[in-house]
Amino acid sequence: MEVTFQFDWSAAFGSIPHLLPGIPWTLLISFGGLAIGFFIGIFFGLLRISPLRWLRWPAIVYVEVFRGTPILVQVLFIFYGLPQLLGSPINALVAGIAAIAVNSGAYISEIVRGGVQSIERGQSEASLSLGLSRTQAFRYVIWPQAFRRMIPALGNQGIISIKDTSLFSVIGVGELVRQGQIYIATTFTALEVYFMVALMYLAITWTLSILLRQLERRGLAGQ
Amino acid sequence: MNDTTQPIVRMQQLNKHFGSLHVLNNIDLDIVPGEVVVIIGASGSGKSTLIRCINGLEEFQSGNLVVDSSELLPYGKSTQALQKIRTEVGMVFQQFNLFPHLSVLDNVTLAPMKVRGLSRDDAISSGKRLLDRVGIADQADKYPSHLSGGQQQRVALARALAMEPRLMLFDEPTSALDPEMIGEVLDAMRELAKEGMTMVIVTHEMGFAREVADRVIFIHKGEIAEQGPPEKLFDTPQHERTQSFLARVLKH
């Protein structure tokens, strides 16, 4: 039997209108999840560097649990597992956003911790010596510097989370991969369609990279 | 007792340990308003730790410490007193510790606005006056990293003075500077001393100490080994440790 590998460009281009509806879902899940994850990350990242041990350990447990388990298991747990506890089903979109939030939150809390700890002790000493409270020192001196140092790592996490949303095709949320699968089921053009799906992810992540580079350059210009 | 004789710093039987290391050993020290005290001693003798206790950047384990009529307690247990003391006591650090994300002017106006509650306009006008006084008025809009070390340290001085402190602490203010920039910082400090500021200075600049100090304190292994007016301490040191320390540092 003869097998021919032929890339059918018309099939590839023809899939575009069927894939495009997935993009808003992919963006909504990733950016919605990341926005929440950012606040989770700040919260646990700051707990993690608290001088009080009983504030530190919940943060350590959180990071270990959500960084140490696969995001696919996390979303399956939320979508199929939690409803058994709650007694009511969870919307697939909500489950996806929640999974990105708790997962990226764990990584972001480590980014926050590292960023804040990277600021020299002299900065807080100078602030305190001027009479600023610890909170003021953090808000006006430590955090703005720490945040600038965190930008590259946060961008990295953003890109990872965008790609992670592809796993959520398993819970039926209509993101990019899911749209591709649905289309392939009728056309059997897996090669062309997945190629286009990959290109669309690349378009999203590449745009984000460019924006981040500009943000970084602007952030550094001040110093 | 009136205000001029009441000491602004009163340290009695102060002790500090880092683990098993006894860093400060029964320190007794009174500083009166207007006095310029220079603390000298070998590195690791505890002189920096001593002045960092005065504004609570270091905790101590036992003894009494009253700064500007607020009492600091052992183990840093007195947040309110600490806050009050820090608004009245300025500090200049060896590494400048300017805020790199803020312009020179914003470095100087931050604390007066956030701590003293000055309006932005008032903070800016007094900030500019202070920058002018230390000779950096034309650099107000630059960021610290664009300034030389000597300029940065003068900004740090202006930043501390912007809080209108009653006491200034200097922790080796010229030790991180290139030799050619030491003079400009010492000049600014000399000026401040002339205006009557109470100053406690940890330094290795013996010539400056002799010229500016009302009193020189020699610290050895966490204890005040000897103190007195600069002529006396530098020319006729009594303690054998003082003699050998001075012989070492004055040789070059």
Question: Where in the sequence are the language-model features?
Answer:
Chain B
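ABC family nucleotide-binding domain
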Residues: Q6-P230
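Pre-NBD coupling/linker segments of ABC/ABC-like ATPases
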Residues: N2-D3, T242
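C-terminal boundary and immediately downstream tail of ABC-type ATPase nucleotide-binding domains
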Residues: H220, Q227, E231-H252
